[in-house]
Amino acid sequence: MADRDKIQILKDALYEAARDHGSDQRLFTQRDLLDMQVIPQDNIGLLMQVIQILCDEKLFVGNTTASGLSWRWRSREDAKKYTSLPNSEIMMVYAMVDEAGADGIWNRTIKNKLNMADSLMKHCIKYLEQKGYIASMKNVEHPNKKMYIKANLRPSDRATGGPWFTEGELDTAFINELQEIVFDFIKQKSTYTSHGGGAGVPGVGAQGGGAQQREKNPKKGVVQGTIPHSEDISKGTKRSAGEISNDDTAAPAPAKKTRPGKPQLLPLPAGYKSYPTVSDIAKFIHHAGITNNTTLSEADIQQLVDVLYYDGLVEPVKVNGRKGYRVTRIPKQDPRTCNQRRLDHDPTKGGIVTSFMGVEPSASGLMEAPCGRCPVYDMCEEGGPVSPSNCVYFRRWLDGDEVQEQVISI
Amino acid sequence: MAVIKEKAECCTLLVDELYGQLPARVYATLFQRGKLSVRLISQFSKLSARQVKNGLCVLQQHNLLFYSVDANSGEAEYSVNHEYAYNLVRTGKILEMVDNSYGPAGRDVMQNLLLLGQTRISDLVAAYQAKINEVNNDDAWLNDKKPELAIKSKAQLNSVLCRLIEAELIDVIHSKTFQSAHEIEKQVHREVMDVYFSNGIKGTKAKIEFEQRVAEGLRKVREESKTLKRKLAQNGGASKRRKLAVGNETNGAPEEEEDLDPALDPRQVIRINYEKCIVELRSRRLVQYVNETLGETTGYVYGQLLKQLTKNISRCKSDPLIDALTPEEKVTPSVTTNEILDKVKTSIDLTLGIGKIPSKSISKSAAERLTPLAPKDKIPFMNQDDSDDDEEDGDYSDSDEEMDTKKENGDAPVARMSRPEQLRQHLLLLAEGHPGFVRHCGEDEWTVDFKPLMENLRATELDSIIEQTSGRQGLRLIRILRTKGKLGEQALQSLSLMRKVDLQQKMLEMRLVGFAHTQEVPRDNKADPKKSIFLWYCDTEQAYSSLIAKCYATMVHCLQVLEVRRQKDKDVLSLAKRTNVKGKEKDMMRDESYARFAKFLKDERLLMAEMMRIDDTLALLQDY
């Protein structure tokens, strides 16, 4: 019958036209399909027939939206999978899994939505799994739910938990390592290392006069000792920032505040423009190639930096609308990197170090007293079973160190 | 007058520690029962009226009481002045502070005032005179090692007193000193009513006027204690010159300087003004904080700035009743760079403490940006940045480029700055970013917004306490809750990047300590707990108040432990008190006894020091 052939041709033409006009996520309304100029004379009846055939062949998927019916196309391979399924139950289950996409779907949801008998659904799922059409997956948000996903899809970030999860478990070791790296990076970029070194520049005093003199003839004794820098200086402007700062601060630094020879971190002047931003950090991480099998987006790094901020280790500084980060409590920071600190740390010297990032919290009187950490603080009262007069913690606190002292004196 | 139990206990124990058991018992009774007459005190405390009077006398002398005369019965009724009682614990800090800024002479006077309580100037002068005479007559030529006196002459005493009065650290007692704030307020109310509103207050307009008049009256009362200061200011021609000598009095300030001071009215009764002392202590604390966050040189600069700025600030927290209605007073004082520069010691190297980088990488415009207006009262802890400063940024970056190119032409990569410029660098650093130590309020003008700054510092203190109790992860969770508000466990988990088990354990831990709380939100009327949503949140105000209570309680415990130790070593201590032993304990006592004695002294020092350190936290949380 010519009519049927015609519809066949129109069907293929419409399918191809739809494919040309958008991805398999795009919804086409009736108007959209007519506007493709495939159906002659905007014949709605004909269009209906064509769409019906396409839907039967699973090449089109119908959708109801607020504005009415619409359709999206499905690839021929996928359609073939549908048509190859033996019965409509299996097809429906497969359709549910297919709809859920990369997030996967819980088997209870399938059951409830399709109102299907348990055994029948199990049979369907088993069939589909055997065929290799769907696979079971794990979702970090609901680790106890049995979920299914189309076999050829990778579970979405929401389901796997993003880069911070490995096999459904939060990878704390990885996070911690990465945090240390980010922290070190920010520390290095947001502070100035003053080497309170011994290289004596005589008489670089505090007075403004001295500074001006230096400005006039910079060749004299400004540069720090060991390596002869004079050539560099004669070249003038070509020096790198690091070198320059060295010769200027190294000398005055030991004058008062620092013990000589010990590098110390100093804050940078106000208005410093290059505090590292999140994108700087992301670039650094990317180029360092630390995470070669996971790619970290800027948003991921932002999450990491936010955690550092919540930990009180870094703080945002806004300069000209550019939000960079710097470490907090700069003068107290250890100039070594976290890793170095870990290597240098001597476990026999006591003190359990929980983190090598940042500084110990500043001491507060309350926490130093035994009461600050007392487990029975709430019931401690003079006259009660636990009271300050019979407090073991106070006794240990006051007498404990004396016992040690005596040992030492012997 | 509501006082938490821990504070009442703490104050009573402090009085006990310093002035003995009798006053302490009277004080405890007053704390328990409120305002009482002598008769009632003796009834409640089971002390005889004579004893009660003795106790009250001591307390009154040290300004630890308020009293008012009941109009009907004609009996005086007493109540506690708990602020002053608590301030006793700050004695050491105040003395140290005075020692630092006014030299040992100032400290000596201050110490005597602390010991004596309120004192008539003539009495103080007489006491010092007696001491000076004693040393001078005491065969000075026989005894080489005569004790070095901090105050060497009456004139010097006078001058020191003038300094302290000018600094408001000492003020004058007047008729209303012994009335509680509430009492004074009532009285002023009555007066205003009698004078201006004999027909009653009608309408909102009259109400406002009434409030203004009351505030005025209260202010007048408050100003009364400053009479001596005003008098000094009136013939203050000399004060300008004198300021140069401040701090150098140890090396014997020139006699003539001292002569310039007007003699103080010997009939005036003076006492220590704790309010101003606390202002000074606050400055010290701020400097400490800057030392930690930005470095010592910057901290020093900040100290000088605060010194200038707080000269005319008499109290840390303004009274809502008195100060609310005076906009002209609200204009916060500011200092200029040059004023600070004048005070910075020449030995300080201002190039220290800030990293040196080429000026190319500094945005001048961003650093120098002025913020002429004080920040509005924002909700504390909610995300504060990102809000208002974005629109301006565009303009700035343009001009910035220009500046940079200009800079590049002159080929000094590291700008070598003049001293004022070096100083400015420190000030700019202070002004930049969180927590706003300084506000750059005008070209070369600087001011400090104490209220938001202290709020920030309070949060920092709380943070460090949380970090010490619950670790860094605990701090992380609390800070997330603070910025984001109430959160469910899922959200908290994804923000904190913590394992579910760890998170739950940590939150539970903090729930027990009282840092975090839960809220249950039922989904439907049945309120099935299985279906309810549970939200975590933190109540910072509550955390503060529980911390404050804990601070007081810990101090109480320290004092109690000290008392226990004292009882334990009673025999040794009584031995050490004997006049023939006193001063040469080591030689006179047996080794074993001496060891115990030394140990006791060590414990006492430790416990006292601990109390002072707790007070640091406490003061920050409630007084600064």
UniProtKB/Swiss-Prot annotation, chain B:
Annotated source species: Neurospora crassa (strain ATCC 24698 / 74-OR23-1A / CBS 708.71 / DSM 1257 / FGSC 987)
Keywords: DNA-directed RNA polymerase, Nucleus, Transcription, Zinc
Region Disordered: start-end pairs: 229-260, 373-418
Sequence segments annotated as region (Leucine-zipper): 551-572
Gene3D superfamilies tied to this protein: Winged helix-like DNA-binding domain superfamily/Winged helix DNA-binding domain
Gene Ontology annotations for the cellular component aspect, listed alphabetically: RNA polymerase III complex
Family according to the record: Belongs to the RNA polymerase beta chain family.
Cell location: Nucleus
This protein's name: DNA-directed RNA polymerase III subunit rpc-3
GO terms of molecular function: single-stranded DNA binding
GO biological process, one term: DNA-templated transcription
Subunit structure: Component of the RNA polymerase III (Pol III) complex consisting of 17 subunits.
Keyword Transmembrane helix: no
